[in-house]
From Swiss-Prot:
D-fructose 6-phosphate binds at residues 37-38, 80, 82, 85, 132, 220, 313. It catalyses: alpha-D-glucose 6-phosphate = beta-D-fructose 6-phosphate; D-mannose 6-phosphate = D-fructose 6-phosphate. Gene3D superfamilies: Glucose-6-phosphate isomerase like protein, domain 1. It comes from Aquifex aeolicus (strain VF5). InterPro entries: Glu6P/Mann6P_isomerase_C, SIS_dom, SIS_dom_sf, SIS_PGI/PMI_1. This is Bifunctional phosphoglucose/phosphomannose isomerase. Belongs to the PGI/PMI family. It holds the Pfam family SIS. Residues 20-153 form the SIS domain. Keywords: Carbohydrate metabolism, Isomerase. It is an enzyme of class 5 (isomerase). Its EC number is 5.3.1.8, 5.3.1.9.
Amino acid sequence: MEEVYKVVEGFYNQFEWEDIAKDLTPYKGIVFCGMGGSGIIGSFASKWLEHRSFNKPTFVVKDYTLPPFVDRDYLVFCISYSGNTEETLSNFEEAIGRGIKPLCITSNGKLMERAKEEGCEIYEVPKGFQPRYSLGFMLSKVLNLLGVDKDELEDAKENLKENLESLKQKGKEIANRIYGYIPVVYSTPLTAHIAERWKGQINENSKSPAYFTILPEMHHNEVMGWSNPELRNKFVYLLMFDEKDHHRVKLRVDITKKILEDFGVVPIMLKGEGNSYLARSLYLVHLADWVSVFLAELYGYDPVPVKTIERIKEELKKHA
């Protein structure tokens, strides 16, 4: 566990500003392709662009195929830490077939090999990590390519560094509250990508089921599941929000909290700290890292191995 803690502690050091910004003006929109620990990069970047009022569409592809309208007028990112993610490789080949040269974020593998063969731009990240422990390296590359301000990125990095000890402590406290229950993260539109990360980190590191859903949509269906106390009490509920959420969404967060409390459930409230949306988002992302590794320790699991995921990959290879 000590080695895992060391990697998690170094998260803030994965962020570095680089002068590599692309001119986004010529493009109709941006497409981010990736799966799992690499796929969350696209979700994060898309939401960050939306918050900056980027006036072109962004699409996150977590599948084998690109949307049919994507052509050479779109900027396409192919993100795979290992370079061997079959869905992302499929996206890459489809893009090449349409005359698109994707920007490739990877550490190695077939994606790097094919990108070199096709003359695509490659943005290499350090080898030797699990994809989920290299989010900062990959996200830093993508944000720099999208033109993040140097001050914004450096402030977010400093925010992580300054809050490291408090994040560890909060992570341990939340892990103790989650232990023995199935976590459900209720997020807002501005925090949905972070809730997705929480789910993935708890799944992979803690070897636990976990789920997330989004306000206000969940107010139109999921809330009725609370009516069944026998099932309701098997879960622990986390309410995630951002200070810049729509005022009606904030009201819905308050209403959700009150109704859960009326059912005798005390939700865990999750709000990022920081001077910018990026800083607050990364704060919550890093909190998930700590929660998930402490929860793994409580359950007696090594956070690193992902045997079932590896088994699926091996089964798929039999049908290549």
